[in-house]
């Protein structure tokens, strides 16, 4: 079957980038270019009981799977629809009990294998790009990444051998490599992780640090909307990474995860880098070497914190945030992205500890520089306004709360579309207060 065109869009060969997606007609800011159902998706373990395992709907009073008591559903329809995939895990979770711990990548890959068996022909998620056409970048993997794939394959065999037929070992290596660079994480309106999925047609889009579209989720459906004016013949670009950081950091991340260096306008001009790594205005300004050392320290502390999250207590994590901010503030302005990173982490710890005043204090410092560093329509900025609005509302400051929530809505109406359930929920929060 030939890849059919999606309305007003075509697959093409993009110079120096391989395959890409191109517009055949104009799209205006806020227009939906296309939507793509998940080829396969899996709800993250931590959200069980809060979201339906099948459609990812967030609601109270979900029904529990009677066998494993771990999966929750809206109703019998969702449970029935999910059964061919849930059965891969249901009895295994009961048998292994506490020892059932496949990674999310393994869980998603198991579902892809099951889907390929059940539905060998092309699916509605693959109008322009089929899963089997995904890039694997196998030749570029370092030993650490290869080892990770081997341990994922071992876990796949350990937890899924009863209900799945596996292809040969080398095909599994390719599949895991494909999932690693083509998978998506589904996030909610506050950018909390909900699950992982494969959206083949969305994966066709190439990356830019000044993207002209944004990807959002409605349940397990991915939606792609314009955040800049798009003209016929323009390539459609999304962003694969968090755009907060300076050019060198962004490209380190892109090379590590996706094996390319970006050459977009932002990366060639480095226009925003100076403001992103803002240095304190002192009568005796820091020397270039002191700045370089502090940037190195900042990158190290970000990595150290990422690892510490898995084993340190909230109060220890907060201490890392506070000490690192204190050290960096001798050279960096508060609007510096490395300072903002640690403030954001500190805010997250405060939210976890239900220290609402502490979280609000950090959020208030973050929001203005965020709005400057990120593109105009940014989910990071929208989710920060949303968190601030909800904190104000919870602390009985209705005027500030309403103002912040309306700022979030203004961005989300473009990024998520005016009819998104998240937006009606937020409007409801404003009215009910």
UniProtKB/Swiss-Prot annotation:
Residues 7-241 form the SET domain. A zinc finger (MYND-type) spans 52-90. Its EC number is 2.1.1.-, 2.1.1.354. InterPro entries: H3K4_H4K5_MeTrfase, SET_dom, SET_dom_sf, SMYD2_SET, TPR-like_helical_dom_sf, Znf_MYND. Its main location: cytoplasm. It holds the Pfam family SET. S-adenosyl-L-methionine binds at residues 17-19, 137, 206-207, 258-260. Keywords: Chromatin regulator, Cytoplasm, Metal-binding, Methyltransferase, Nucleus, Phosphoprotein, S-adenosyl-L-methionine, Transcription, Transcription regulation, Transferase, Zinc, Zinc-finger. It catalyses: L-lysyl(4)-[histone H3] + 3 S-adenosyl-L-methionine = N(6),N(6),N(6)-trimethyl-L-lysyl(4)-[histone H3] + 3 S-adenosyl-L-homocysteine + 3 H(+); L-lysyl-[protein] + S-adenosyl-L-methionine = N(6)-methyl-L-lysyl-[protein] + S-adenosyl-L-homocysteine + H(+). PROSITE patterns: SET, ZF_MYND_1, ZF_MYND_2. It is found in: Cytoplasm, Cytosol; Nucleus. The modification Phosphoserine is found at residue 283. It comes from the Eukaryota. SUPFAM superfamilies: SET domain, TPR-like. Interacts with RNA polymerase II and HELZ. Interacts with SIN3A and HDAC1. Interacts (via MYND-type zinc finger) with EPB41L3. Interacts (via SET domain) with p53/TP53. Interacts with RB1 and HSP90AA1. This is N-lysine methyltransferase SMYD2. The gene is Smyd2.
């Amino acid at each position: 079957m030939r890849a059919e065109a999606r309305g007003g869009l075509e697959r093409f060969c993009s110079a120096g980038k391989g395959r890409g997606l191109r517009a055949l007609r104009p799209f205006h800011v806020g227009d939906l270019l296309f939507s793509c159902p998940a080829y396969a998706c899996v709800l993250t373990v931590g959200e069980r009981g809060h979201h339906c395992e099948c459609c990812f709907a967030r609601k109270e009073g979900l029904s529990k799977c009677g066998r494993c008591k771990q999966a929750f559903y809206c109703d019998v329809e969702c449970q029935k629809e999910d059964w061919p995939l849930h059965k891969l895990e249901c009895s295994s979770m009961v048998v292994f009990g506490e020892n059932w711990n496949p990674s999310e990548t393994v869980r998603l890959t198991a579902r892809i294998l099951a889907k390929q068996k059940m539905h060998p022909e092309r699916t509605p998620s693959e109008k322009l790009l089929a899963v089997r056409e995904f890039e694997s970048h196998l030749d570029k993997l370092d030993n650490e990444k290869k080892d990770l794939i081997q341990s994922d394959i071992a876990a796949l065999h350990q937890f899924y051998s009863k209900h799945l037929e596996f292809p040969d070992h080398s095909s599994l290596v390719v599949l895991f490599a494909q999932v690693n660079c083509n998978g998506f994480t589904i996030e909610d309106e506050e950018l909390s992780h909900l699950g992982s999925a494969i959206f083949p047609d969305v994966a066709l889009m190439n990356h830019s640090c000044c993207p002209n579209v944004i990807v959002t989720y409605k349940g397990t459906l991915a939606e792609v909307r314009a955040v800049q004016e798009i003209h016929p013949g323009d390539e459609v670009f999304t962003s694969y990474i968090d755009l907060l950081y300076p050019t060198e950091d962004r490209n380190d991340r892109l090379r590590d995860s996706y094996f390319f260096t970006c050459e977009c306008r932002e990366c060639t001009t480095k226009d925003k880098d100076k403001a992103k790594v803002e240095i304190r205005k002192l009568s005796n300004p820091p020397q270039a070497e002191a700045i370089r050392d502090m940037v190195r320290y900042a990158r190290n502390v970000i990595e150290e914190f990422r690892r510490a999250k898995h084993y340190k207590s909230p109060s220890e994590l907060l201490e890392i945030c506070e000490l690192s901010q204190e050290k960096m503030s001798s050279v960096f302005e508060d609007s510096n992205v490395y300072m903002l990173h640690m403030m954001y982490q500190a805010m997250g710890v405060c939210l976890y500890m239900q220290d609402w005043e502490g979280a609000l204090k950090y959020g208030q410092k973050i929001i203005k520089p965020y709005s400057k560093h990120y593109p105009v329509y940014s989910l990071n900025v929208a989710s920060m306004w949303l968190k601030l609005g909800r904190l104000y509302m919870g602390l009985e400051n209705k005027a500030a709360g309403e103002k912040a929530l309306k700022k979030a809505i203004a961005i989300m109406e473009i990024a998520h579309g005016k009819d998104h359930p998240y937006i009606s929920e937020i409007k409801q929060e404003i009215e009910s207060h």
